[in-house]
């Protein structure tokens, strides 16, 4: 039976072996108060949003919801290539909400205090990073990209010490699950085959039920996860999203984007773009995201070798053969995505050159990634000085000739482009301005306005004009920070 607020918890993860989690209560805060509450998401979850919006105590750890059984999850992670034992150092999973369609959603408090995995951390979070996660996750959702969601951001009334004292906050994160590649690395590290098999069976039942009964369930799971990760990174590349800290603990088995600490969106097109202040070597640069995803999947495959085959050599061969297919699978899906961005139906031998030549021109001209593709939807040559060059005009003629050979009319091509090229993204300078106003001036107006613009990213709305403009030189964001 649902509670008075519509919560229907059915907490299956904590029925797994205790090695995978620790019981852990969220730690109370001084004076909880909502700064953001996601009414639409609450309703999707089957919750009474109107009633809940009056009760920040449930989203701060001050009171527990009926049916919640809080835990902190254990996991490991390759962080910039080095394996580390991690776990939820500042997050508490309250439980799993069943919505009206029987779909299961993790409800997690991020910034809820110290846990058994906190090590030297305080377990808390600052307002700015929690607002960033809310903004970016909801923007990705509106862009039709698989992602965790944000139900609320709650001020704690306490201060957290980072470089300076900052207002504290807790994010209520909603996810299909929080099972990560790092979860499997942790389980494999326990040297307990039964534990690993139970985790595999649980993940298949929760996320890939069609695989139940597969002849080689470990290999089948690996390939299914690889397909979802390819779809995810192709979508990131489509909108110029740079995750920034693509460690194995930030790769979900559900295929959702997760953890948005130093993430950013690319303005000027450059495959080498890096924003994260801790990514000194460009490991997680925009153009490296496909290859690092393949690397992360390799670490996932390593955890499953014993289940793929009793013979280690045969298991390695199976995993390697599957992993080698990543590049071809990715290229096919990336090419299909780029064709949609350019309104191309069918396939011609020149298409690859047409795509490559445009990207080369964009890189050389420091062209805005988002606006260039959106400008192509205009009738005739796009407005703007950069489009008057002979090189672009020659490319534009070739492209229009290719559109004329499409199997569908021009109107269909333009519709396809509008649906795959956003007009509005969370531009880094606008996100930073919103976070600064909220953290320093207690002013949420810029955040609300930005969220409104991001709610319909493919629409042409005059009210969104300022959100489409690239940053002025004095507004440019050159680095982002994880905020932990």
From Swiss-Prot:
The keyword S-adenosyl-L-methionine does not apply. Mg(2+) binds at residues 250, 259. ATP binds at residues 87, 89-90, 110, 122-123, 173, 180, 259. Transmembrane segments: none annotated. It catalyses: L-seryl-[protein] + ATP = 3-O-(5'-adenylyl)-L-seryl-[protein] + diphosphate; L-threonyl-[protein] + ATP = 3-O-(5'-adenylyl)-L-threonyl-[protein] + diphosphate; L-tyrosyl-[protein] + ATP = O-(5'-adenylyl)-L-tyrosyl-[protein] + diphosphate; L-histidyl-[protein] + UTP = N(tele)-(5'-uridylyl)-L-histidyl-[protein] + diphosphate. Pfam families: SelO. GO terms for molecular function: AMPylase activity; ATP binding; magnesium ion binding. Its EC number is 2.7.7.-, 2.7.7.108. It is an enzyme of class 2 (transferase). InterPro entries: SelO. Belongs to the SELO family. This is Protein nucleotidyltransferase YdiU. The lineage of its organism: Bacteria, Pseudomonadati, Pseudomonadota, Gammaproteobacteria, Oceanospirillales. The gene is ydiU.
């Amino acid at each position: 039976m649902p509670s008075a607020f519509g919560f229907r918890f059915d907490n299956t993860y904590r029925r797994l072996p205790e090695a995978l989690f620790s019981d852990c209560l969220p730690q109370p805060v001084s004076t909880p108060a909502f700064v953001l509450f996601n009414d639409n998401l609450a309703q999707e979850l089957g919750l009474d949003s109107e009633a809940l919006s009056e009760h920040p105590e449930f989203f701060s750890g001050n009171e527990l919801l009926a049916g919640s059984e809080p835990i902190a999850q254990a996991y490991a992670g390759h962080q910039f290539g080095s394996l580390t034992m991690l776990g939820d150092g500042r997050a508490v999973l309250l439980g799993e909400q069943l919505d009206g369609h029987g779909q299961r959603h993790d409800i997690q408090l991020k910034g809820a205090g110290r846990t058994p995995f906190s090590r030297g951390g305080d377990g808390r979070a600052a307002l700015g990073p929690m607002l960033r996660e809310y903004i970016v996750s909801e923007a990705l959702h509106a862009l039709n990209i698989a992602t965790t969601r944000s139900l609320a951001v709650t001020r704690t009334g306490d201060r957290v010490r980072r470089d300076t004292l900052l207002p504290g906050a807790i994010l209520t994160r909603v996810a299909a699950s929080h099972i990560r590649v790092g979860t499997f690395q942790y389980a494999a590290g326990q040297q307990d085959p039964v534990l690993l098999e139970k985790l595999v069976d649980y993940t298949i039942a929760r996320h890939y039920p069609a695989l139940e009964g597969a002849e080689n369930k470990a290999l089948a799971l690996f390939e299914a996860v690889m397909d979802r990760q390819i779809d995810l990174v192709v979508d990131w590349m489509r909108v110029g999203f740079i995750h920034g800290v693509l460690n194995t603990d930030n790769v979900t088995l559900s295929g959702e984007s997760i953890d948005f600490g130093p993430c950013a969106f690319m303005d000027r097109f450059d495959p080498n773009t890096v924003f994260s202040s801790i990514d000194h070597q460009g490991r997680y640069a925009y153009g490296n995201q496909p290859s690092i995803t393949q690397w992360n999947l390799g670490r996932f495959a390593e955890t499953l070798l014993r289940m793929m085959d009793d013979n280690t050599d045969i298991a390695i061969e199976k995993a390697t053969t599957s992993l080698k297919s990543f590049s071809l699978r990715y290229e096919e899906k990336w090419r299909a995505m780029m064709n949609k961005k350019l309104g191309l139906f069918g396939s011609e031998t020149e298409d690859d050159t047409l795509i490559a030549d445009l990207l080369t021109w964009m890189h050389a001209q420091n062209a805005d990634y988002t606006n260039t593709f959106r400008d192509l939807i205009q009738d005739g040559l796009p407005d703007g000085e950069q489009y008057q060059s002979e090189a672009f005009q020659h490319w534009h003629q070739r492209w229009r000739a290719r559109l004329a050979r499409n199997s569908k009319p021009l109107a269909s091509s333009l519709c396809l482009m509008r649906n795959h090229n956003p007009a509005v993204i969370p531009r880094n300078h606008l996100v930073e301005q919103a976070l600064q106003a909220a953290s320093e001036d207690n002013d949420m107006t810029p955040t609300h306005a930005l969220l409104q613009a991001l709610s319909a990213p493919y629409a042409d709305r005059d009210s969104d004009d300022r959100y489409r403009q690239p940053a002025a030189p004095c507004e440019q964001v050159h680095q982002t920070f994880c905020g932990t």
